[in-house]
UniProtKB/Swiss-Prot annotation:
The chain crosses the membrane at residues 8-28, 36-56, 78-98, 100-120, 199-219. Part of the ABC transporter complex TcyABC involved in L-cystine import. Probably responsible for the translocation of the substrate across the membrane. PANTHER family: L-CYSTINE TRANSPORT SYSTEM PERMEASE PROTEIN TCYL (PTHR30614:SF0), MEMBRANE COMPONENT OF AMINO ACID ABC TRANSPORTER (PTHR30614). The gene is tcyB. It is found in: Cell membrane. This is L-cystine transport system permease protein TcyB.
């Protein structure tokens, strides 16, 4: 087997700190210049798509509900890696040149849009119907009631699950390495390929960087939730 032919894939008797120090910045730079921008862009576009999808699935127009329901079902029913490869090879099939990074943004945005739409839809439905009636009573239209009364309340409810979606997306971007996006994990793979005898150390280092990023984001999430809780009646 391939693994049996490799040099020792263990930590050995001592951790190669020189290699860890030399590889730390190249791996981290992949996170700074690719992983984080990829996550932010995908999340922003995904949230726009999620809001559109959530509202469309609550629409009274049946064909609209059906189209977006199929979209959500297709995304939730297929692996993210498969979706990534489909988008990556879809545009060249129509003679359209698209670099790996924008291909990854499109794929991750579509994925986030489907999953986040369910969160947003559930958050909107959790707002008491009396809030709708209150908006109508003071002369607001359906659209104004939605955007000025309902969505602000739904937003607070959706913060925890959407924050978890964002943190999960950070980790999911490692799949972009499969289409040659030079993100954090891809950098680790490249360095590991040149140091096969210490490849485990490189991957542990990459995992540590992912963990630190996600841990810091979790702290930010906790602060936001505590601030929002101040406005909730106990």
């Amino acid at each position: 087997m391939f693994l049996n032919n490799l040099p020792a894939l263990t930590l050995g008797t001592a951790i190669p700190w020189d290699l860890v120090q030399q590889s730390f910045w190249p791996i981290l730079s992949g996170g700074i210049y690719y992983t984080i921008p990829l996550t932010i862009l995908s999340f922003i576009f995904g949230m726009i798509l999620a809001l559109i999808t959530a509202l469309a699935r609550m629409s009274k127009v049946r064909p609209l509900r059906w189209v977006f329901s199929v979209y959500v079902s297709a995304i939730r029913g297929t692996p993210l890696l498969v979706q990534l490869f489909i988008i990556f090879y879809l545009f060249p099939a129509f003679n359209v040149t698209l670099d790996p990074f924008p291909s990854a943004v499109i794929a991750f945005s579509l994925n986030v849009g489907a999953y986040a739409s369910e969160i947003i839809r559930a958050s909107i439905l959790s707002v008491p119907k009396g809030q709708w009636e209150a908006g109508y009573t003071i002369g607001m239209t359906h659209q104004k009631t939605l955007f000025r009364v309902i969505l602000p309340q739904a937003f607070r409810v959706s913060i925890p699950p959407l924050s978890n979606t964002f943190i999960s997306l950070i980790k999911d971007t490692s799949l972009a390495s499969q289409i040659l996006v030079a993100e954090l994990f891809r950098k680790a793979q490249e360095i590991g390929a040149r140091n096969l005898d210490q490849i485990l150390v490189i991957y542990i280092e990459a995992a540590f960087i992912y963990w630190i990023i996600c841990f810091l984001l979790s702290l930010v999430q906790h602060v936001i939730e505590r601030r929002l809780d101040r406005y909730v009646a106990k």
